Amino acid sequence: MSDWQEKLQKEFDLAEQARANNNQGQARVCARRAAGIAIREYLARKGIRPSSPSAYDLLNLIKDDPFLSLDLRLIAEHLTLRVTEEFKLPVDVDLVAEARKLCDELLKQISP
């Protein structure tokens, strides 16, 4: 398993652990970081060097990628949403599951 794959799995493990501890905020953070790892690998394999290492910036970058499906761009949009004053998402989505889907789909597109 390569370094980025280990980091990706670690973030998803941490997200599940945070969720088990009823820490939804930390689970969202881990989901975003996992997405950032997959996006960096996706862009690197396409020969694109992102200008920022931030997962949030990378998610914003792919939200407008015309080569990605509308579903994946919507997931990127969800992963960049701000929580309300009650620390809730303004939409009813499972960001960990959505991040997994985004990662899986991006990595399928770059698999040899």
Q: At which residue positions do the language-model features occur?
A:
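Generic structural signal for well-ordered, non-membrane alpha-helices
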Residues: 6-13, 33-37, 74-77, 101
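Short, mixed-charge, low-aromatic patches
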Residues: 13-16, 31-35, 52-61
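Short, surface-exposed loop/turn segments at secondary-structure junctions
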Residues: 21-25, 48-49
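A general secondary-structure boundary signal
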Residues: 11, 27, 83-84
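Hydrophobic alpha-helical packing segments in soluble, helical-rich domains
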Residues: 27-45
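Short, charged, amphipathic alpha-helical segments
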Residues: 25-32, 93, 97
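Long, charged low-complexity segments
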Residues: 43-44, 48-112
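Charged alpha-helical initiation segments
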Residues: 1-23
